[in-house]
Structures are given as structure tokens and as C-alpha cells.
Swiss-Prot record:
Gene this protein is translated from: atpF
Biological role: F(1)F(0) ATP synthase produces ATP from ADP in the presence of a proton or sodium gradient. F-type ATPases consist of two structural domains, F(1) containing the extramembraneous catalytic core and F(0) containing the membrane proton channel, linked together by a central stalk and a peripheral stalk. During catalysis, ATP synthesis in the catalytic domain of F(1) is coupled via a rotary mechanism of the central stalk subunits to proton translocation. Component of the F(0) channel, it forms part of the peripheral stalk, linking F(1) to F(0).
Keywords of the record: ATP synthesis, Cell inner membrane, Cell membrane, CF(0), Hydrogen ion transport, Ion transport, Membrane, Transmembrane, Transmembrane helix, Transport
Subcellular location: Cell inner membrane
Stretches that traverse the bilayer: 7-29
Principal subcellular localization: membrane
HAMAP family named in the record: ATP_synth_b_bprime
Protein name: ATP synthase subunit b
Subunit structure of this chain's protein: F-type ATPases have 2 components, F(1) - the catalytic core - and F(0) - the membrane proton channel. F(1) has five subunits: alpha(3), beta(3), gamma(1), delta(1), epsilon(1). F(0) has three main subunits: a(1), b(2) and c(10-14). The alpha and beta chains form an alternating ring which encloses part of the gamma chain. F(1) is attached to F(0) by a central stalk formed by the gamma and epsilon chains, while a peripheral stalk is formed by the delta and b chains.
Amino acid sequence: MNMNATLLGQAIAFALFVWFCMKYVWPPIMEAIEERQKKIADGLSAAERAAKDLDLAQANASDQLKEAKRAATEIIEQANKRKGQILDEAREEALTERQNILTQGEAELETERNRARDELRKQVATLAVIGAEKILERSINLEAQKDILDNITAKL
């Protein structure tokens, strides 16, 4: 019977130990396990969200990159068009300036030609009067000389 009392004592001690563990030890362990499971589940869902966010961000980045390339291409095309316009305007302006310079040069040349022609006429008239004076060996008065020069100039 000794053995039975010992066995019964051990069974009671074991039952008290189990009750004590279930009352005070088991709940914090279960709470820690549940908290750990929750953290793991939250981590997995966060990883899934992060993966989805990454995919979305990559898609957005790809779209933005495409949009940026399109915008850059459009800007380059506009710049090329503007370059062509500027070159055309500069070409037209240069041609207009060239024409103005040529017209001005021709006008100056014509003016200079007329001035030289008038100067030559005066010199020829003066030489003719001097020659005529020498031929006639007489001096013509200044008023008569002026009239003769004007007549000769007008005829030339």
C-alpha cells in the first residue's frame, strides 16, 4: 500500500503541477505563440503588400519612363521644328539684307557715276573754254564763260 499512497501522492502532485502550469505557465506561452503567429502572419501579409506595391511602383515607373521618353521626343521634335523656322527666318533675313545692300550699293554707284560724269563734263567744258581761249587768244569775261560752260554742260 505504500506504493499506492505514493502513486496517489504523485498523481495529486502531478495534477497540481498540471493545474498550476495550465493556470499560470500555459497562458503566457500560448499568448507568446499566438503573438508570434500574428507577427509572422502580419510579416507575410506585409511582404505580399510590399510585393504588390513593388509591382505597382514598377508599373508606374515604367509608365512614367514611357511618358518621359514621349515628352522628350516631342520636345526634340519641337526643337527641330523651331530650329528649321529660325534657319528659314535667318535665311530670309539674310537674303533681304543682301538685296538691300545690293540696292543701296547700286544707288551709291549710280550717284557716284552721275557725280563723276558731271565732274567730267565740267572739266571738259573748262578745257574746251581754255582751248577756245587759246585758239581765239582772247579772254572771255567771266559771265560769258559761265554761259558757255552751262551750254556745253547741258549738251553733254
